[in-house]
């Protein structure tokens, strides 16, 4: 998320904590539990080391050696973006594979991007978009055949609309 965008407020629940951990692992290179704890504290989430350890274990987070040799936490097949970096090449390739067969049209409308899919595919497409750290995207809402991508502003929506269309066209 950009520093100019609205900050995400989270309730003090386990689900919100797990979501914050997942978001931190997707947007930062986390090399230790203490580093992750500091990031969570910055987001207003206080957590003990024991709880953090259990959460990471439950999420199947593992330490993985990155291309530059750094050992950092990752979850499953998540694509770790560097600070300030958007979706990486691998993340775009994963998104493109999904979007290519499932997106029938894309249009910007205000700060929203409206993505149409075949019947029954919208929630899957929304999930793929939500799992990537996409600059300027706050989240998605999915119905049966339509996904609304909520962006921080109108210009970002136009940019992300074109970007999603290009991914779907690869």
Swiss-Prot record:
Belongs to the ArgR family. The gene is argR. It is found in: Cytoplasm. It comes from Bifidobacterium longum (strain NCC 2705). InterPro entries: Arg_repress (IPR001669), Arg_repress_C (IPR020899), Arg_repress_C_sf (IPR036251), Arg_repress_DNA-bd (IPR020900), WH-like_DNA-bd_sf (IPR036388), WH_DNA-bd_sf (IPR036390). One of its GO terms (molecular function) is arginine binding. It comes from the Bacteria. Regulates arginine biosynthesis genes. This is Arginine repressor. GO terms for biological process: L-arginine biosynthetic process; protein complex oligomerization; regulation of arginine biosynthetic process. Pathway: Amino-acid biosynthesis; L-arginine biosynthesis [regulation]. Keywords: Amino-acid biosynthesis, Arginine biosynthesis, Cytoplasm, DNA-binding, Repressor, Transcription, Transcription regulation. GO terms for cellular component: cytoplasm.
